[in-house]
């Protein structure tokens, strides 16, 4: 059975930690592919700074040279408010899917629309600091136990990089060396994004 990882996000902009997490998940979980899913309009976040075409192009540049990474534009193509549950319901049958999330997302997972449906349809893989254990919220832990489901741990050393910090640096004209894939940094400079 094909195993596919799913990494959703605004990717505003995509940065080195996104790519490192996708590569780590592919290797550690034995995934055939990791699909990066850019949000159209994420309901729990501030409005996006870069347009969908710019974010898609930056993703294309970031995954060049990573043949097991792909872009899944389902949320952008659907438009409107972005809910993971809708994305999961639209997945084609056949593969085994793993939704990749961080410990911060795990803690608010039970606030996601139709979270039980998400957890019933796909596997959840949580990026944790090496040696740390997963501590899901009580409501999720109870649901997982009742449905004989588990969380998959994905050891991932945290990286001191965030899209919001990168946007602030770019707006201030500060350096972003090592935070962005080089082709993405060049694209941002060429198109004067985040200024």
Swiss-Prot record:
SUPFAM superfamilies assigned: Nucleotidylyl transferase
Annotated Gene3D superfamilies: HUPs
Example GO BP: NAD biosynthetic process
Catalytic activity: nicotinate beta-D-ribonucleotide + ATP + H(+) = deamido-NAD(+) + diphosphate
Pathway: Cofactor biosynthesis; NAD(+) biosynthesis; deamido-NAD(+) from nicotinate D-ribonucleotide: step 1/1
Keywords of the record: ATP-binding, NAD, Nucleotide-binding, Nucleotidyltransferase, Pyridine nucleotide biosynthesis, Transferase
Superkingdom of origin organism: Bacteria
Xref: Pfam families: CTP_transf_like
MF terms (GO), sorted A to Z: ATP binding; nicotinate-nucleotide adenylyltransferase activity
Keyword NAD: yes
EC number(s) given by UniProt: 2.7.7.18
Functional description taken from the UniProt entry: Catalyzes the reversible adenylation of nicotinate mononucleotide (NaMN) to nicotinic acid adenine dinucleotide (NaAD).
Family classification: Belongs to the NadD family.
Name by which UniProt lists this protein: Probable nicotinate-nucleotide adenylyltransferase
